[in-house]
């Protein structure tokens, strides 16, 4: 009997040892993602800064590196897989895909097209038709501003030959308006006109949205990268849109995130907040109101493709369809 009890105790002890909890597995390594933003770090990228600083990317299992490049360079790098995901507008995506660069646009960030033509309040320019024979500063006959300018002029039955273009390849064209050397200039609705309006009378601003629905900046991915890192990319988009919603509700939160990322912005909080508030307006439209932030406007894409394909010296090298340009795989609805 004593032997039996001893055996039972030994078995119980063995059973307890066998039921011990295994040591926890180490957490998975975060997925490294290189995210391309516009050329100059600014308050306009506040949602990316907030998502990074608040830990939304980290909590989603991501190790995010934010880099700044010009739009055409980002398109190429994303197509090559050197950058995982980046901001680019539709007028860059269409020519790239038509030339065989394997990218897709998967989430809208700017629901409105940001490129505009603006003129000082005292310029005597009140309508697009008033631009005839006027000096307009712009970087060159290429890119999103050039396509936008052709759409605006065409709406008043004007062509680029009906105005005097003053080209600034170094992107200093805003200064020509400040110096009175140009009557108007191309720019961004959430930048130069905002700054001018803070310093004096609000400028005249011509937008293209009611003329041709050119597609604003959104997130593009390479096809191979999407296949290899789809889950991580979806997590990044979800975290970014979460931060976007928070900034819409509380712009000061976005401003603080931008200043933490770019301390020089603190030198003029009033201007930076005004720029951010103008930017927030451009993140939203009827499509995002109906379908949520990031939603893709397929009819708008088709209208843009049709317009760009019909331009003189069209940048569209070969016919493309909307399905070749877009992916629904980045938006986890």
Predicted segments — roles?
Residues 16-26:
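Bacterial lipoprotein signal-peptidase II cleavage site
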Residues 91-92, 172-267:
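Pocket-lining segment of extracytoplasmic ligand-binding domains
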Residues 24-169, 174-179, 183-190, 205-207, ...:
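Short, glycine-/small- and polar/acidic-enriched structural segments
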Residues 301-333:
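Conserved C-terminal helix/tail region of periplasmic/extracytoplasmic solute-binding proteins
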